[in-house]
């Protein structure tokens, strides 16, 4: 046998051995292979478009595939449950979700968590299965709204007194209930001169908020303030104030922002907005989910913050960044 043949056989054996080892050894897991869906309450909401933009950016930065999922409205609870079940069936590395309803999503999240890690953002659920929960302290957000409303009323009348109301977008949403409780508690303990004459729930539609506010104005001509506890209600209530030219008389604090509510703020139909950071929730939600999927330790609860925005401070760089996020 020639030396050339011996070398060729040895080379072949070496290559075959290397191929066997490569086949036998587990392949490393790369971030590019990881899928982490984000499931929001309402994909049509500007607020949630900001959150999805944050998640999308995290996916790009971290090399993670991020399917952007969600119901068509916050009232579509069953739709979100189905989306969650389908997402889990795809065996992702983790799931990021903002539950539409505190009680209704509890058991579905418990069930999903048996298969994949669940990260919660924005709103809670009746479940202890979240590996981490990133949200505004919504109770504190309600208190901030009460302080802002009292200040606006005092600025207009010289005193923290008068009839006020609160309109909540939909019953049963954890974040909204916490805002409501924080607002009512702050008014009760800090502003005895403010009397809550109406505590109403809508159906998640801005038109309903508009109609409710119009009815409140008609039935309660002495009303001086309203807390509209989310973006949809701020849109509807702000529209009612604008149409009736009552910005000087009835002060409204909304929650969250978009072009319409910022316009109302500039024009005086709204006195203030409590603004969260949904971009951070989306970005850090994906980042946290990836860490959990790798077995890393993460914080159980993360407060993503809230700020009172008024016409006086809306041009400040920090506030401007919250009002004008990059969503593309």
Model-flagged regions — what are they?
Residues 14-19:
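Sec-dependent N-terminal signal peptides
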Residues 20-29:
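C-terminal segment of classical bacterial N-terminal signal peptides
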Residues 1:
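SF2 helicase/translocase NTPase motor core
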Residues 4-6, 29-328:
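A residue-level marker of the well-folded mature domains of exported/periplasmic proteins
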Residues 7-13:
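N-terminal export leaders
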